[in-house]
Amino acid sequence: MWIRECRKEMGFMNGLIYFFLPGCPFCRQAQEYWAELEREEPKYAGIQAVKINEREQADLADRFDYWLVPCFFLNGRKLHEGAADKAQIRAVLDQALSELL
């Protein structure tokens, strides 16, 4: 029920959503891995994500069930939460590719 209500309010719910905090070293590292993967494998460059700064958009972030950043949701379900290595970011991007493109 909650996801359905959010989908009505937030049309972007069906996609990749990335929650982050400025200054978070784990978020910065995740973004660096993402950029590296885009350079290494151009297929990742086509992935669009809604990026939500949880400090500036706290009202929106509070609607999602997570505690740690970086955090990735895909089509309403959590894919990854917390510090991530390059392989974990690749797994998020691969899942997004398989479901979105």
Could you describe each region identified by the protein language model?
Residues 6, 10-40:
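Local sequence-structure signature of Cys/Sec-based thiol-disulfide redox active-site neighborhoods
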Residues 28-32, 63-64, 84:
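Generic recognition of short, well-ordered alpha-helical segments
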Residues 38-44, 97-100:
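Alpha-helix termini
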Residues 44-58:
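Thiol-based oxidoreductase modules, predominantly thioredoxin-like and allied folds used
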Residues 60-63, 92:
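CheY-like receiver
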Residues 63-73:
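Structural micro-motif
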Residues 73-101:
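Non-catalytic, surface beta->alpha helical segment in thiol-disulfide oxidoreductase systems
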